[in-house]
Each structure stands twice: as structure tokens, then as C-alpha cells.
Amino acid sequence: LLEKTNTISEREKQDQLLDAMDLEREKGITIKSHPVTIFYKAKDGKTYKLNLLDTPGHVDFSYEVSRSLAACEGALLIVDAAQGVEAQTLANMHLAMDLNLAIIPVINKIDLPSANLPNVYRQLEDIVCIPHEEAIHASAKMGIGIDDILEAVVRRIPPPETEKDGLLRALVFDSVYDAYRGVVSYVRVISGSVQRGMKVKLFATDEVYEVKEVGIFTPKMTRTDSLEAGDVGYIIANMKSAADVKIGDTYTDYTRPCPSPLPGFKEIRPMVFSGIYPVDSSDFEALKAAMAKLQINDAAFSFQAESSVALGFGFRCGFLGLLHMEIIQERLRREFNMDIISTYPSVIYEVTKTNGEETNVDNPSLLPEPQEIQEIREPIVKVFIMLPGEYIGDIMQLVLEKRGSVTNTETIDDTRVMLT
């Protein structure tokens, strides 16, 4: 898409262009959403400004996806012609449907010898409930169908709706920390406009800042005169602390503020907890600063100070899953040169004491005395497992080994079954 619209030159072409982190390139996954503005001259002769957000697929980063979707009107649902509809395809599609986005299905990799289009058609209709005629056939590698995708975006995805009052409303959907420029907020301008020199206010903190720079992503940060309604771009406003801006907050004009903030994002609940401690106890403050900077860039990561008899002072950290935990630990080592020790991951337990008091415990060392405990409850997950029919016995055995129970078995098509 970037190549076809001349957003990037031949010289800039590389695999995983929008995956800026070394970790993303090494693991072949997207961890952070990446915005980019492209200009497309359509068949009707008009030039359209399209704001593209490349989001992760893995369920551990679903919060990243949901924030990005809140800044969009539509989504391209990419299905692999050989692999078919995968679990994460479904999970992310439900997020898009909850936000009433226009969904354009794209069947990619049709050039592969193993591509099975009839099977993908059936899955799209049976599992995703989208008529297969709506799907665009494409091969990113061969450049097939790219024009069709761009035309479909122009035709099928509605243009941004804006408030008629012209007051500035800009949703903060992400932010990063720059050592030289401070906090950089990624925003979607819902209404009004913002330019350099303007005084803006954030609703959550009620703080006022002067805008130093605004711009768009092409994919690199590119300064512009202003951001208008419908634009996705960035605002730099002299913020020095990672805590100054909250993801989901609203920027408005200090002199003509809008009456209320935009609906933000639902608070995310960590699922997995682990202790992270510095190997050298003198690095405690440096580790704390590193975590604060990571948190500004990853709102799903939480931490609070704790101490251990064996490991000294460190932090109890919350993550969305095991991959999320692994990525955070690796980023601390690579980006901040931290030498860390991490404890075995655990979940939150609900404990009812004999006196009727209820408490949540995410660290086994904080459990009450055995004689004070009436009941301990652990999280239960309702899981839908899509699998090839021939593996049903093995998977059922695995579920039982993990203390699960199969409540329903449903045949999806000739080859696949869904267990609940």
C-alpha cells in the first residue's frame, strides 16, 4: 500500500517497514501499532488522504488493537489464503464490530501454491459471517489487488464525521517518550484543528501546554502546519514527564474548550503478574524510571514497588499475557540496559477470609494465614478452540490435563471443529 501510493521510495523499501523495534523484526510480529498517512489518487480523479494504522495480531496486544480501532472508521481484515481464518482474526474482528467499523475482508497470499480459496470462502461465510463476494483477492508480494484495496477503502469506508461546533477534540490513542523532545502524543483529531503555538488543555489532568510541533507519519514523523479534523498525527507540547499524558485523554483548545472529553478506553486489567528486581540493588531508581517510560508507551503494563526477603527491592508487574511479559522484560534489557531478575508468573486470586472479608492477592507471599482462609478462587476462562478434526482427541486430553472441561463440540466445516 505504501509503495503503490509512493509514500515510500524504492530506497526505503524493506520487510516489516512499520515495525520499528528490533524485537518486532526478530520475532516477525507487530507489538506496537504504527500510524502512517498516505495520499491516494482514486479512479474518480480526486486525491484522498488515508490514515492507516498497522496493528498487532497477537491476543496479548489486543489493547493496542482496540485503541487503534477507536481512532478509525474502517478496517482491512487480512486473511491468509493458505492458513484460512485464524483465532486472532476472529478476536480482532469482534473488536472492530463492537465499534461499528466498516470491515473490508482481504484474502492475501493468493499466489501461494498452497492457497485454498474455496476453503477460505467457506470460512469467511461460516465463521466470520461475511459474504465471500465482498473479499478482495490480493498478493502483497506480487502487487496483485492493491489498487482494488485502495479503491475499496475510498468507496466502502465512510469519511470521518466531525462535530459542527469546530471546537478542538483530539483523542490520545498512544504516546512515546523522546529523550530530546519529551512526550510525543499520537492523536486522532475528531473536530477542530491544532497548530504550533496554540495553548491546549488535557481533561484528565487539567494541565495547560503550549504546542511546540504537530505533524503526520509518512511513516517517519513529518512536521506540518496544522492537524485538521479527521487527521491522525502527533502533538509535541513540552511535556517532560511520562505521567503528564494519559492514553484515552482528550486535547482541547484552552481558550475555547469543548464541554466534555471524548469517551476514552476501558481500563485494562492485567492477567499475569510477576516480580521484576534489579540484579544490583543500586539500580532500583533507574529501573523505576525505565518502567515509567515503558508504561507511557504501553498502557497495558502496570507496576508497583514491592520488596522480597531474598531479592530486595523491586516491582510487582502486571501483564496481559506471557508474551507481553516476555516482551517487556526484553525491552528493559535492550532499551534501558537493565540487568534484571524476574519471578515465576502468577495470576490474581480472590480470597474469602473466615471473618467474611474478601481480598485479591497477586503474590502468594501475601496470602493470609491458612486458618484465616475460608475459600480461594482462581480466574476461569471461557475458551473457543478451533482445530482440525483429526486432533480433537489430543486437544480434549490437553484441556483435561489443564483442569478444563469441554462443554460443547461444533463442526465448522469438513475439516475443522470448534470446542468450547
Where do the protein language model's features map onto the residues?
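Structural and coupling elements of P-loop NTPases
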Residues: L1-T420
